[in-house]
Every structure is written in C-alpha cells, then in structure tokens.
Amino acid sequence: MSVLVITGTDTGVGKTVATAALACAARVAGIDVAVCKPVQTGTGPVGGTGDDDLVEIGRLAGVDALHPGWRYPDPLAPVAAAERAGAALPTRDELIGMVRAADAPGRLTLVEGAGGLLVELGQDAVTLRDVATELDAPVLVVVAPGLGTLNHTALTLESLAAQHVPCAGLVIGAWPAQPGAAEIDNRDTLARLAPVRAALPAGVGSVSPVDFERISATAFDPNWLAGLL
C-alpha cells in the first residue's frame, strides 16, 4: 500500500487545500492518486449547502478517484456531530477497510482526517493516529505559520513519535504574501522540527483550477512525490 495520512495542527490551517495541492501535484507528475475522507462533518442537511471537502479537492486538483465515508450535517467534532444526527460513528475495521478498498497497486492514496490527529473519528475512541498506525502509513502535518504554531506542531510530532508513526513532513497551509518576523522565524524553526514539504500561498484555494495546478506543481519536490510510492 502507498497510503499517506494528512492531518492538521488545528482547525482552519488549510488541511483540505493542502490535500488538494498534493493530489494535484501528484497527478501532474503522472501518479495515480486517490483521496479518501473517512469522516466529514458540517455537510448540512440533505439537499442543502454545507461543507464537502472531497468536492472541493476534486474541483481544485482535477482528481476523480474520490472516496467519501461517513458524513454528518453539523459542523462539530465527529462524536458530537454523530450524536446530534442520531447516527453511529464507523468502527475501526470500517475505517481501515475503506482506505484499503480505495488503494491499488501503483496508486498513492491520500487520507484526510477530520480536525487534528487525536480527534475521535470512530467508535471506541479510534483516532486518525490509530488509523495511520494500523495502515503503517506516514503522516503529513499541515501547520499554520503564525504565533502558536511551534507548540502545536511539536505536540503533534510528539504524539506521532509516541506511537512510532513516521512523520512525512510539514506543509504550511497558508503562507502570507507579506510575512512578518514571527512567520519568517517560525518557518526556519519548523524546518528544524521536520522537513517542510511546501508552503502554500494564503488564499490559493480561491484561485482558478488552472492557476491552482501551476502553483501546486511547483510547490512540492518531484523527487519527494516519487518517493511516496
């Protein structure tokens, strides 16, 4: 299996856009890529308008192999969203089975979590870290550039190391057009914690798919992409 799990240090750090950028870069590099979103909250009522991360990833990345999982209307943590919907969370086996079903020989399968690394995604308090451990998959961490990111990032990396889950590196999800001293210093420090694989421009999720492809294709090192398979 060639599975890469993607998490974020916080809500709103750009995890979905980073997943789309990586998927787009892989596609441009000639890699067969699929994207899984095992648990999605905030989808809104049936027929209404809510968040749909996979639709956004498909629109931006030009990737068709999109695999949705369990969806809940309210924009809450999965446990709370499932309770409010009167629906069950998936079991560990269901989560793992979904990813394995999406993967294929020669394919890179990206798995985007919901929230951070230790947010409960399934029954019996299963987390994204548990999923990565079960799949023997590395984890790419999407981080913010500003104040607070060093502590959040270090805590996430420490949590991965505690369960011997390899970190595939960091992606800065929204690099400002005019970074200040904090952002510049943080970028250097983040690179000492783990390799920074890309720093995506803030607002890149709002550009056209053509521009998104151009930006994504140059954001990631092609040699690193090839090594993910």
UniProtKB/Swiss-Prot annotation:
- Look up the record and give one Gene Ontology term from the biological process aspect: biotin biosynthetic process
| Compartment(s) of residence | Cytoplasm
Required cofactor names: Mg(2+)
Question: Major place of localization?
Answer: cytoplasm
Which residues are listed for substrate binding in this entry? T41
Q: What CDD domains does this protein map onto?
A: DTBS
List ligand-binding residues for ATP: G12, V13, G14, K15, T16, V17, D53, E112, G113, A114, G115, P201, A202, G203
Give the pathway. Answer: Cofactor biosynthesis; biotin biosynthesis; biotin from 7,8-diaminononanoate: step 1/2
Q: What is its EC number?
A: 6.3.3.3
Catalytic site: K37
User: What does the UniProt record say this protein does?
Assistant: Catalyzes a mechanistically unusual reaction, the ATP-dependent insertion of CO2 between the N7 and N8 nitrogen atoms of 7,8-diaminopelargonic acid (DAPA, also called 7,8-diammoniononanoate) to form a ureido ring.
Subunit comment for this entry? Answer: Homodimer.
- Protein name, entry field: ATP-dependent dethiobiotin synthetase BioD
